[in-house]
Amino acid sequence: MKTLLVFLLLAILVAVLIGNIQVEACKDLTECDTFDICVKGRCYPSTLG
């Protein structure tokens, strides 16, 4: 019973973390900082800055 409870808690934690990562993903250049670029949902520093 304890093992099942721990497994469920871990599954919920992983789901929350995945949800947070998806929320933070950028969709276009305006969501990143001035000198950053959006590539595949993440902001990376550009070489121009």
From Swiss-Prot:
Signal peptide annotation: 1-21
In-chain residues carrying the UniProt-annotated modification Leucine amide: L48
Subcellular location: Secreted
Annotated GO CC locations: extracellular region
Protein's UniProt keywords contain Secreted: yes
Main localisation: secreted
Propeptide residues per the UniProt entry: 22-27
Record keywords, A-Z: Amidation, Disulfide bond, Secreted, Signal
Iron among keywords: no
Tissues/organs with expression: Expressed in salivary glands. Highly expressed in the head, body and tail with a 2-3-fold higher expression in the head.
Disulfide topology: C26-C38, C32-C43
Function description: Leech salivary gland peptide with unknown function.
Family, similarity comment: Belongs to the annelide toxin family.
More info: Does not show effect on voltage-gated calcium channels, potassium channels, and tetrodotoxin-sensitive sodium channels. Does not show activity on Nav1.7/SCN9A, and shows very weak activity on cation channel TRPA1.
Protein name per UniProt: Peptide HSTX-XI
